[in-house]
């Protein structure tokens, strides 16, 4: 196993690129690189991500960043990124969840792009992370009026059926989905299916009369709504404790499709994915033997140009999502929680033995590893780490990001 310590990983403005040359063999030939995090809302992970973004952009010419949010959410963030609006105005272009997850990285990114003169494309590779279909429905209503006006009343009907699904997180939105009558849920799902099949059936005719970009956007919004409704159903059962093994894979399948489609359609794109380790890994996600999910990374692993870099830490605590939290607009609060114990067969113990505990450590999984577990949130994920990730970044602690007011 190849490894080295780094002193500047958490100093993106003063980065020593020589410390990152260990990653060159991993990144060469890649067009998709996932930069993970073992938990959301961690200050050190945001700093380390900023450093790796700099490295990938300046040394390997990556030109796009994908976020765990919907396309419309990302378009608003992109508007802010390319405007004269200051850091203090980011919340006006964002929602509470996206700001909490990505605020620190985005504020750094805006400053970096301004000072360096570089340009980066910002895209949403996910469903709306609120699982609120309102924005997708609104955009679809505008487009369908132009490309298939006979279906505009149908979209309006869907908007009415789903009007109460207006949460700011999956916790809230899935609960509101559960409050809908079963007949209303089924009518919404069948309504989206009808739209999808009609658009596909009429595609040769519709494409002759409308801008191809409009048709693609309509198809994209319908697909997003379809996956969102199924994910709402799944998350309701997940929070109720009645979901089936692997159910949450639906969202990961969607993300993989978006990324794969983008890279195939744009041969010059080289994209950095900022997502949780559990979405990026190239093996099934499991915490105690059961199948939790087939992650996005396992789908993307079928491409020879995908790489996954995980983040973990050695700290005694980690920010964790605590729910229910009725006073929070997201239905959960972020609480500093004891991290899972570092065990003999863990990645964290390997780092301690190899690199010590004083500095951050970069490790390539270029040889079989005895480590078969790694911290994830306040637990540990169990997998063959040398198959799951191409490299693993370990920082010494995991503190709550100062921008997170949850």
From Swiss-Prot:
CDD domains: Ere-like (cd14728)
UniProt cross-references to SUPFAM superfamilies, sorted A to Z: EreA/ChaN-like
Record GO biological process: response to antibiotic
Keywords: Antibiotic resistance, Hydrolase, Plasmid, Serine esterase
Keyword Hydrolase: yes
Pfam families per UniProt: Erythro_esteras
EC class: hydrolase
Any one GO MF annotation of this record: carboxylic ester hydrolase activity
Coiled-coil regions, chain positions: none
The protein's Enzyme Commission number: 3.1.1.-
Keyword Hydrolase: yes
Role of this protein: This enzyme confers resistance to erythromycin through inactivation by hydrolyzing the lactone ring of the antibiotic.
Miscellaneous note of the record: Erythromycin esterase type I and type II share no significant homology except for the region from AA 270 to 300.
Protein name: Erythromycin esterase type I
Native species: Escherichia coli
């Amino acid at each position: 196993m190849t490894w080295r310590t780094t002193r500047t990983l958490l100093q993106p403005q003063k980065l020593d690129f020589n410390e990152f040359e260990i990653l060159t063999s991993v990144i060469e030939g890649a067009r998709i690189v996932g930069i993970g995090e073992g938990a959301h809302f961690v200050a050190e992970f945001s700093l380390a991500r900023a450093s790796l973004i700099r490295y990938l952009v300046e040394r390997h010419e990556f030109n796009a960043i994908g976020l765990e949010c919907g396309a419309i959410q990302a378009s608003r963030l992109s508007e802010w990124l390319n405007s004269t609006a200051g850091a203090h105005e980011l919340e006006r272009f964002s929602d509470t969840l996206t700001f909490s997850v990505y605020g620190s990285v985005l504020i750094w990114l805006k400053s970096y792009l301004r000072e360096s003169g570089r340009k980066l494309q910002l895209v949403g590779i996910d469903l709306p992370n609120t699982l609120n279909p309102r924005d997708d429905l609104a955009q679809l209503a505008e487009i369908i009026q132009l490309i298939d006006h006979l279906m505009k009343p149908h979209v309006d009907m869907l908007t009415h059926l789903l009007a109460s699904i207006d949460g700011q997180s999956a916790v809230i939105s899935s609960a509101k989905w559960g409050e809908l009558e079963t007949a209303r849920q089924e009518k919404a799902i069948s309504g989206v299916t009808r739209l999808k099949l009609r658009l596909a059936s009429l595609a040769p005719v519709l494409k002759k009369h409308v801008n191809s970009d409009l048709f693609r956007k309509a198809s994209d919004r319908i697909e997003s709504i379809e996956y969102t409704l199924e994910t709402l159903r799944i998350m309701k059962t997940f929070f109720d404790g009645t979901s089936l093994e692997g159910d949450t894979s639906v969202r990961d399948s969607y993300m993989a499709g978006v990324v794969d489609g983008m890279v195939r359609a744009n041969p010059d794109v080289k994209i950095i994915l900022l997502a949780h380790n559990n979405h990026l890994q190239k093996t099934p996600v499991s915490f105690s033997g059961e199948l939790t999910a087939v992650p996005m990374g396992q789908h993307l692993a079928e491409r020879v140009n995908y790489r996954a870099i995980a983040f973990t830490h050695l700290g005694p605590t980690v920010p964790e999502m605590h729910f229910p939290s009725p006073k929070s607009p997201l239905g959960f609060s972020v609480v500093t929680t004891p991290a899972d114990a570092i065990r003999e067969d863990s990645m964290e113990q390997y780092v301690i033995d190899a690199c010590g505990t004083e500095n951050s450590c970069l490790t390539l999984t270029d040889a079989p590893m005895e480590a078969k577990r790694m911290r994830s949130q306040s637990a540990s994920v169990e997998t063959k780490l040398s198959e799951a990730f191409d490299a693993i970044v370990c920082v010494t602690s995991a503190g709550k990001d100062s921008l997170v007011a949850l």
